[in-house]
Every structure is written in C-alpha cells, then in structure tokens.
Design a protein with these regions (language model features):
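N-terminal pre-catalytic "stem/leader" segment of glycosyltransferase-like enzymes
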Residues: 1-41, 127, 254, 259-265
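Structural motif
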Residues: 1-12, 40-41, 43-49, 68-69, 117-118, 122-124, 182-183, ...
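Extended catalytic core of nucleotide-activated donor transferases of GT-like folds
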Residues: 27-77
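Donor nucleotide-activated moiety binding/catalytic core segment of transferases
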Residues: 31-35, 148, 153-203, 207-208
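Short, solvent-exposed loop/turn segments at secondary-structure junctions
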Residues: 47-50, 70-72, 124-127, 161-164, ...
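Conserved catalytic-core segment of nucleotide-activated headgroup transferases in glycan assembly
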Residues: 113-164
Length: 265
C-alpha cells in the first residue's frame, strides 16, 4: 500500500475505479474514515449516491473523478465507462476530436422520423440524491406542468425498466423512440444521448452530456432539428470521455483525460 498515493479511489467494488487509480500510482481507500480525513489527495469514485468522496473533495478544493456507465456503445454488457472531472458527466465545451474512437464503437445512428409525442424521463432515487433533488416526484410533476405550458402534444412518462436485461432486450428505449416521438426531456439521463444519436431532439434540464446539444423547454412544441455536423462532433467528443477497463489499466484513459481538461481551470 502506497503511503503517498497520487489518488484515492472509493467504491463498493473496485472493478471500475481500481484500474483507473492504480494506473497513476493511486490506490483504493481503506474506508470512510480515510475519505473523511483526506484533505490533500484527489479522489475517484463510482456510485452517484455515494457522495462521501465528492463532498470531501468539494469541501477541501480537491479534484475528483467520477466513473459510471459509458455514454455510448454499451449493449447487453457494460464495456465502456465514462470518466468525468469534478462532475457526474462531461459538461465542459465540446472539443474537436478525430472519428477513430467513435467508429470503433460501431453504434447504430439510424435517423428516426420525428412524431408527435414528448417522452419525459423521470429522475430515479439515486440520481436525485446525487444532484440534491429532494423529491423526484415533485420534479416530474413540475416538469410535466412546464411542458404543458408550451405544447398540447401528448406527454409520455417513461419509467426505467427495473431489469437491465429487460432494458436491453424487450423494453428498449430505442423502441420507444420509434413510437411517434418528437422530443425527449431529461434531467441527466443517458436516454438523452441515445435519442440525439438517432436524431431526436433533447431538452436537458440538468447538467449532462447533452447540455451542449440541448434545446430549450420553451421550444418543446417545435424543437429545431439537430445539426448533423454538431452531433458528429459531440459524439466524437463523448467517445473521448469514456474508456474500457483495459484503457484505464494501461493509463490511456488518464492520458486522454489530461488532454481533454488541459485548458479547463
């Protein structure tokens, strides 16, 4: 165990966080006591509702790295993991990147015809806790009421299927998108990314990877068509902010992230 680690990792299971921190000379924490006593070392963690590392980092002005399911390219099994600095998702401005990593993912980018319905994705409990939203039901009610101020379109609230197996096989979001959908409204759900990659406009009400391609809620009745070039640049950028475990282990993830955040104070 290093007495002077470059980074401390915090997670219930270290299969995502461990490879990332160890590649740069860090290690996993010994527990909550070490997290709360740390005032100098950057931290990495997973689990959006596991806020101890984030709270401690913010309290003492430390950088933290958050690791979670990747934005694009995961299918039945999770092989890609997003890593963002001082945020739950990458929200810094889009930077130009080549297409190599995006092509490697081989994602389905079929453009779907827009229909008439507005899909609203509720915030689940863990996400609301991470973002400090005390009552997800109130958020949903207020969001639906706001949408009704600007459109008479049918509003469909799509709750997340409990089983990942169901989500990726029989009750898929991609299927819902093809069912007469005009736009998707999220807080910070990855459903927004999936919608945009198929040409369905998104309104992101919270800080998310969709922030820079998001429309405004006031435009919900007739959101502009997504710009093809902007969407391409955005998807390339996302592909440079998510990594496989082998890329974390090799230090590739760290190297790319340093380039991504080099100009961000």
């Amino acid at each position: 165990m290093s007495d002077n680690p470059a980074m401390l990792g915090a997670a219930k299971k270290d299969k995502w966080v461990g490879p990332f921190v160890r590649a740069i000379g860090g290690r996993m924490t010994t527990g909550l006591d070490e997290i709360y006593s740390n005032t100098t070392i950057p931290m990495a963690f997973s689990g959006i509702s596991k806020t101890a590392a984030r709270t401690q980092a913010q309290k003492h002005g430390l950088d933290y790295w958050y690791i979670d399911t990747g934005y694009i390219g995961n299918r039945r099994f999770k092989t890609w993991f997003r890593i963002s600095k001082n945020d739950f998702q990458v929200t810094i401005p889009i930077q130009p990147r080549p297409a190599d990593r995006l092509k490697k993912l081989g994602i389905n980018r079929t453009k779907f015809a827009r229909g008439n319905k507005i899909i609203v994705i509720p915030i689940d409990g863990k996400v609301s806790e991470g973002y400090g939203i005390s009552d997800p039901d109130t958020w949903l009610e207020q969001t639906v009421n706001t949408i009704k101020q600007y459109t008479d379109r049918e509003i469909v609230v799509r709750h997340r299927p409990a089983s990942r197996e169901t989500r990726v096989t029989t009750d898929t979001f991609i299927g819902a998108l093809q069912n007469d959908t005009s736009a998707v409204v999220i807080w910070a759900s990855n459903c927004g990314v999936e919608a945009a990659q198929h040409g369905i406009p998104v309104v992101s009400l919270g800080p998310s990877a969709c922030t820079h391609i998001s429309g405004k809620i006031e435009q919900i009745d007739n959101l502009p068509t997504l710009d093809t070039d902007q969407t391409e640049a955005w998807l390339r950028w996302l592909s440079y902010n998510q990594f496989s475990n082998s890329e974390s282990e090799s230090g590739t993830a760290w190297r790319i992230l340093q380039e991504n955040y080099a100009s961000i104070s």
